[in-house]
UniProtKB/Swiss-Prot annotation:
Keywords: Acyltransferase, Amino-acid biosynthesis, Mitochondrion, Transferase, Transit peptide
PANTHER family per record: AMINO-ACID ACETYLTRANSFERASE, MITOCHONDRIAL, N-ACETYLGLUTAMATE SYNTHASE
Gene giving rise to this polypeptide: ARG2
Catalytic activities: L-glutamate + acetyl-CoA = N-acetyl-L-glutamate + CoA + H(+)
CC annotations in GO: mitochondrial matrix
Protein name as annotated: Amino-acid acetyltransferase, mitochondrial
Organism: Meyerozyma guilliermondii (strain ATCC 6260 / CBS 566 / DSM 6381 / JCM 1539 / NBRC 10279 / NRRL Y-324) (Yeast)
Entry's localization field: Mitochondrion
Length: 568
């Protein structure tokens, strides 16, 4: 009878655990669908992180999960003195599914953060853990004067205790941390650091514990502990983790938490650049910071953040062979926001993009001003126009001089539009009216802009003839924004384009244009933008100053209607 009772209790317990697990999975999936704005984003997130959650297991749990088995394997290896990270899956008795850790490395600057912000930061870490991210914290003490280690040791210890207390001592959930005081070695006070034992980081990570790394190194020559730059520590830690065997982990995010926030932008009135494509924009932004619109001390701090983030993202791309890692620079206050669609770190985990599009016009009142910059190593962007081509600027000449590959351009256009380009007619039409060609990456995307004649006038208007993203990249975060920003910079004064009225992309175009117009009989909608529309609109029939908007719109409609279809 007692055995029957025990079996009954166990059955009830298993059913309750199953209901709780099922409810947790359902709530997680619902929150993901709510926070992502497109089906593609939700799909991309689930494809990357689904192994962290046992989504496919719908039966009541009667034993250890794959994650539990993997965790036990790692801890057993650590206790027996074997390597955790070499041939991890080949040595196990049973073949375990590979579940890589998805890391986010946080560099915390200036620890004078309010208790209220720490509470929000703690909740952000809890959310990240629930979303399958394994955080690693590096505390930054670069503001401490480089005096003797002993002089500042107590200050650093007290700061560490404050951080641990802020993250752990709350009733509404459990965040566990583990301080790592001196895991780096150096020699003769050099700027090169080695991680003594990666197991000290991996074991807590596999147990769901957040390691807190102190920027301290042991000098093997002087046998003394010494300070280290937190950003240098982050760099060498990222390199060591990236060298682990494939499938062990991936560095998804590198986050600088800094009171000064993201990299300032002149275009955005010194609020932050929304998205930085480092391969294309790095040198321009460095030059922009030296123009003199911010104090030198602040400028140097922003330059340091930009330089180190560029180094880190270059390192992770070179080590992994992919551009998956994302950099985020934001403030403690913004990290403490507990809203998936307003917290740029959470939102980026879910969507891999900034909370607003970087190609939205910054002058619009509806465009938020941010203190966060999202950075990617990104793609190279080639811009071809009369300023960098010595001969007659025609499409044929660009092909003849190997400035672009015609076959690859045609393939991109066919792939992007899902139609076959009428090559002969199209290139004959644009050959002598070409204004600008933009090529992103390895023909990942492109734009072709032409000069179109205004009827009854010698004036010309820049017309965005083709804007193409390869199908494989149409969900790639930021690529369309990167190309469109270049288009707008190349023709900032006046630009028009057309799109079929039923095109689902039109919502995106509406947000980036000054206006649009179409006739009832036409299948096309013509969009327009440019600084020309900053002028006062001329409402007088006889006035010569200002912008004659009616005449402009009439010209745009005529151009849009006169251009023949390009695809068969």
């Amino acid at each position: 009878m007692s055995k029957l009772r025990n079996l009954n209790r166990q059955l009830i317990s298993n059913i309750k655990n199953h209901e709780l697990t099922t409810s947790t999975k359902r709530n997680l999936i619902l929150s993901i669908l709510k926070s992502t704005t497109t089906k593609r984003e939700a799909k991309n997130y689930l494809q990357k992180y689904q192994n962290q959650f046992d989504f496919n297991n719908s039966e009541p749990s009667t034993g250890k999960t794959i994650s539990d088995s993997q965790r036990e394997l790692l801890v057993d290896r650590f206790l027996s003195g074997r390597s955790l990270h070499r041939s991890l899956y080949d040595e196990s008795n049973q073949k375990l599914e590979k579940i890589p850790l998805r890391l986010a490395i946080f560099n915390f600057k200036q620890l004078s953060i309010s208790p209220r912000s720490w509470k929000g930061i703690r909740e952000t870490f809890m959310r990240l853990l629930n979303l399958g991210i394994s955080p690693v914290i590096v505390l930054d003490f670069d503001h401490v004067r480089n005096e003797s280690f002993k002089y500042n040791e107590m200050y650093m210890m007290n700061s560490l205790n404050r951080v641990m207390n802020a993250l752990e001592k709350h009733e509404d959930g459990n965040v566990q941390t583990m301080p790592l005081w001196s895991i780096f070695t150096t020699k003769d006070n050099s700027k090169t650091f080695e991680v003594g034992s990666l197991e000290q980081i991996l074991v807590p990570l596999y147990q769901g514990i957040i390691p807190i790394v102190m920027p301290i190194a042991y000098d093997t020559k002087t046998t003394k502990q010494t300070f280290a730059s937190a950003q240098e520590i982050t760099y060498f830690l990222s390199g060591a983790l990236s060298d682990l065997s494939p499938g062990t982990l991936s560095i998804e995010k590198i986050v600088f938490i800094d009171p000064i926030g993201g990299i300032p932008s002149i275009e955005r009135n010194q609020t932050s650049h929304v998205f930085i494509n480092l391969s294309q924009e790095y040198s321009d932004i460095v030059s922009e910071l030296f123009i003199g619109y911010i104090e030198p001390e602040q400028r140097d701090l922003h330059l340091q953040n930009l330089n180190y983030m560029n180094k880190l993202l270059t390192l992770t791309r070179d080590k992994s062979g992919s551009d998956d890692a994302t950099g985020i620079i934001t403030t403690p206050h913004i990290m403490s926001i507990n809203d998936d669609q307003l917290n740029p770190i959470i939102y980026n985990v879910l969507t891999d993009r900034p909370i607003i599009s970087s190609s939205l016009p910054s002058s619009r009142d509806a465009t938020p001003q941010l203190s966060t910059s999202v950075l990617k190593k990104g793609v190279d962007v080639k811009v071809l126009d009369t300023s960098n081509f010595s001969g007659t600027f025609t499409f044929d000449n660009l092909v003849r001089e190997d400035c672009l590959d015609k076959d690859r351009m045609v393939h991109l256009l066919n792939d992007s539009f899902g139609k076959k380009l009428d090559e002969e007619a199209y290139f004959r039409r644009i050959n002598n009216s070409l204004a600008t060609v933009v090529i992103a990456g390895d023909y990942d995307g492109a734009a072709i802009i032409t000069w179109e004649n205004v009827a009854g006038s010698d004036k010309k208007v820049a017309y965005l003839d083709k804007f193409a993203i390869a199908k494989r990249n149409q969900g790639l975060p930021g690529l369309a924004d990167v190309i469109f920003k270049v288009i707008l910079q190349s023709h900032s004064g006046e630009l028009i384009w057309r799109s079929q009225k039923k095109n689902p992309v039109n919502k995106w175009y509406f947000e980036r244009s000054r206006g649009s117009i179409s006739s009832l009989k036409s299948p096309w909608r013509v969009f327009y933008t440019g600084t020309i529309f900053d002028k006062r609109i001329n409402k007088s029939k006889h006035g010569s100053s200002g912008l004659d908007i009616k005449r402009k719109i009439h010209e745009y409609i005529e151009i849009g209607e006169s251009i023949p279809a390009s695809f068969t």
